Design a protein with these regions (language model features):
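N-terminal leader/targeting pre-sequences
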Residues: 1-257
Length: 259
């Protein structure tokens, strides 16, 4: 597996308001990102992300659509320590005879993984490829409260934090396959499964409300729409394989840690 450094690795929101939280004495700051498609990867989806941050507590909401469906998992991360921008189409390189952008190509732009937006359990960079604990399907509606590191909080405050949703359908056949070859992150995965699909840099927002439904107040996450359910995954070690029936590939279950 090609090593990648890990830190220390928008649809308009509905008008319904959710009042700023009052469960801490530390002021809350709202950050918002418009998630735009990585067009070099033949993506047409869009989305929005919002974070309310108080100290190291982050109430995170992501809404997206136009992604690969059929239960395909979409890893989502807050990237840090880069330039705080998303890759341009001109940065595409040749991958298996096709012009596209993979994770490594864009790392200088959005940086390394700081937080993995898993639906449960561990949310550190160790869970970067924990495919059974990421949202799945063509649309995502994600909400979770997490504790982020000092470095992730600092990157949000400095405008260097970027949200990236991964997983593309470059050849338009509705599933992940090897049209772009193997992923540079894990040779057992197709590149389509890990290449960036949507990207957006976080900026301080003037909004003082969360999307309709709001962020939850516990550690768990909510996600609506089609997707993979943890009941489909057999328990086991970090090497346990998750058969997803997409393009004949089995996606590796990584870094599964529950709290």
């Amino acid at each position: 597996m090609t090593a990648i450094a890990v830190a220390a690795v928008p649809l308009a929101f509905p008008a319904a308001a959710w009042a700023a939280p009052t469960d801490t004495d530390v002021p809350w700051t709202t950050y918002q990102a418009s998630l735009d498609p990585i067009t070099a990867n033949h993506v047409t989806g869009s989305g929005t992300a919002m974070i309310q941050l108080s100290g190291n507590t982050a109430k995170i909401t992501v809404t997206a659509s136009g992604l690969v469906g059929g239960g395909s998992p979409h890893a989502m991360h807050i990237h840090v320590d880069g330039a705080g921008v998303c890759p341009k189409p001109s940065e595409a390189k040749d991958h298996n005879g096709h012009s596209s952008i993979n994770v490594a190509d864009a790392m200088k732009d959005y940086g390394m993984i700081g937080t993995s937006l898993t639906t449960s359990g561990d949310s550190t960079p160790k869970s970067a490829l924990a495919v059974d604990r990421f949202p799945a399907g063509s649309s995502v509606k994600y909400s979770r409260t997490l504790e982020v590191t000092d470095n992730v909080a600092a990157n949000l405050k400095s405008g260097k934090a970027v949200l990236v949703v991964h997983g593309i359908d470059y050849n338009g056949n509705g599933k992940y396959d090897n049209v772009l070859g193997a992923s540079e992150l894990d040779k057992t995965l197709p590149a389509e499964a890990t290449d960036p699909a949507l990207c957006g840099a976080f900026n301080v927002s003037q909004m003082t409300s969360m999307p309709g439904g709001g962020a939850d107040t516990g550690d768990g996450a909510t996600q609506t729409g089609s997707g993979i359910h943890t009941g489909m995954v057999a328990g086991g070690s970090a090497a346990a394989m998750v058969g997803l029936g997409i393009g004949g590939f089995a996606l590796r279950r990584r870094g599964v840690t529950t709290r």
